[in-house]
Amino acid sequence: MSVRVLVVDNYDSFVYTIAGYLAQLGAECDVRRNDAVEVADAAGFDGVLLSPGPGAPKEAGVCPDMVRHCAEARLPMLGVCLGHQVLGEVYGATVTHASELMHGKTSLVRHDGSGVLEGLPSPFTATRYHSLAVVAETVPGDLVISGRTEAATPGTGGVVMALRHRELPLHGVQFHPESVLTEGGHRLLANWLAVCGDAGAPERSHGMAPLVRR
């Protein structure tokens, strides 16, 4: 079953790579710029993806309202990087400057195997482009921290890398699944497409190669 995905482009240079991954997996994508889309435009779609982008969640235009709409409509939502931070902030978490600026750097991510992370190894390698991060201690009970960076010092936790809502189909990842250096990017997006209604997407993701921009 092919699903229709609304991709909210937060003026990010890699948004069409994400859309390309989704298309490889069989999804029909409609990419629209943040300032050219309204909450009502989500009608008729099976899921909404909030892309990475510059700035802070408070500057993310329609994205906070889109998260609220997806929650009310029980419409599957995936936030990537900035979109992930918006999800956290909408539910009351604090987003602040990360301890380290990450631009194209990789980290190991440990996770609980739930939601969009199902079937990925733990730890796996993820590529990060961000200077802000969700503060783990402020994440409310509505959300689950499903993935963190592997801490340099055992027992000290790690940077929040993935969130999911306990009851609603809302997910967020801080890292970039579309990066060629991220392990299991196709599988992660396929898991989300399964949430959107395409149960066969995870199986189709096996063996897919990353898209390399030229």
Name the predicted role of every residue range:
Residues 81, 130, 176:
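Histidine-centered divalent metal-coordination motifs
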Residues 180-214:
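Acyltransferase
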Residues 115-167:
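Catalytic beta-strand/loop cores that center a nucleophilic Ser/Cys/Thr
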Residues 126, 171-175:
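Active-site-proximal beta-strand elements of phosphoester/diester hydrolases
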Residues 29-31, 95, 145:
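Generic structural signal for residues in well-ordered beta-strands
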